[in-house]
C-alpha cells in the first residue's frame, strides 16, 4: 500500500505553496533613475503621478537600440526606460517569466531629467 503515502505526499507538495502562502512576498532588487523621461509623457502626467504608484514594466526585445530594453509606463503613458546600464538582469528575469513589479519611489523637479524620478523594482515570490 505504498500508493496512499505517495499520493498524500504528492498532494501535499502540490497544495503546500498555496496553503502556506496567503500573501505575496516582494523583494526589492533594484532602485534606478528613469531614463529618457524627457522624450516621453512624464511632463504631461507630472501632477498626477505619485511616489508609491505602480508602474508597468514591458520588455522590448526587438528594440533597435538595446536588446535588453525595458519600457516603464504609468496608466498607459510611457514614461521612459530602465537605464541601459541597469537593465540586463531585469530583462533576463522578465524573459524567464519571473514576476516583477515596479513602483515610483521618489520624484522631484530637477533640470537634469535623470534626477526627476527614481523607481524601485521588486521580484514577487
Regions found by a protein language model. Name each.
Residues 2-11, 18-125:
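Conserved active-site motif detector
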Amino acid at each position: 500500500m505504498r500508493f496512499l503515502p505517495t499520493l498524500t505526499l504528492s498532494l501535499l507538495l502540490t497544495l503546500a505553496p498555496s496553503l502556506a502562502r496567503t500573501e505575496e512576498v516582494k523583494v526589492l532588487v533594484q532602485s534606478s533613475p528613469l531614463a529618457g523621461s524627457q522624450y516621453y509623457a512624464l511632463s504631461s502626467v507630472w501632477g498626477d503621478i505619485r511616489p508609491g504608484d505602480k508602474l508597468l514594466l514591458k520588455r522590448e526585445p526587438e528594440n533597435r537600440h538595446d536588446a535588453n530594453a525595458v519600457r516603464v509606463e504609468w496608466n498607459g503613458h510611457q514614461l521612459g526606460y530602465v537605464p541601459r546600464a541597469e537593465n540586463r538582469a531585469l530583462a533576463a528575469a522578465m524573459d524567464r517569466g519571473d514576476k516583477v513589479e515596479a513602483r515610483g519611489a521618489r520624484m522631484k523637479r530637477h533640470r537634469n531629467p535623470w534626477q526627476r524620478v527614481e523607481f524601485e523594482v521588486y521580484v514577487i515570490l
